[in-house]
């Protein structure tokens, strides 16, 4: 994908990110749906700016991705981040399906994991840090509600560092789906699949790797041998910020039941569930969410540095 020639009217890369690409510095992509739909203002904008600073301190270059005025942007200004934070749910949530239409209409759009992967690949960025990937929703055997993130992971050559799939999802079916499409699910220093707010779940990852170097080597071999598609690196939330399983699961079960009662479906379901869980936990889940993003940004920076070292 990085070989495609994209018009600068469609894709703009910030000077900081351009410099990183030109001089072979490690870059880390960041999504923008977490800003507009994942957290309330002003925590959303503050967190996004602090995550960028965290990546810089690790010796990598952050590249927050969004659509601004119909332009796919790789690297946002603070004003653009704050715009997305203030506008919140008024900003269109953009996955693969929506991308051409939001760009063509000249609108603002917040990128999901799937569309962030697409734009990162267009720019030549191989590592992406987020909170949690989308997955198979609970009740998908009736609704077929499966996040487009999973198909993107099957097809697009970007490594996604996350705290597992969001725990509002069906984690068992999500792992099965990833296995079917040949997506490696790597546990960073763990064999148990992290469950976003919790460090463990009843499900296992496909392989445990204990260092950024091992992960970077696997990325290089995978893509050099023509095995297209992404890798998921599941990084457990730090222990001091993890939530008790009983309380978070009770909040999730209640939120899922309320979503069903209110007919919340499709791309609105995840923002609804995360916001409702935050309310039900008295804001504790939001605090955990913020901390796990920082943790993932640090690991993603280390992986990006190692991959860049191998790539030369």
Predicted stretch roles:
Residues 32, 37-39, 45-101, 224-240, ...:
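Glycine-rich nucleotide/cofactor/substrate-binding loop typically near the N-terminus or early
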Residues 110-112, 141-154, 158-179, 212-217:
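Active-site glycine-rich loop that binds ribose-phosphate moieties when present
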Residues 19-22, 27-28, 57, 119-122, ...:
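Solvent-exposed alpha-helices and their adjacent loops that cap or buttress functional pockets
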Residues 227-295:
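A C-terminal functional module that forms or caps the active site or interfaces directly
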Residues 28-30, 62-67, 103, 109, ...:
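General beta-strand structural signal in soluble alpha/beta enzymes
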Residues 198-224:
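Anionic-ligand binding region
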Residues 42-48, 80-85, 135-154, 177:
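A glycine- and small-aliphatic-rich helix-loop capping segment at beta-alpha/alpha-beta transitions
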Residues 1-24:
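N- or domain-start disorder-to-order transition segments that initiate the globular core
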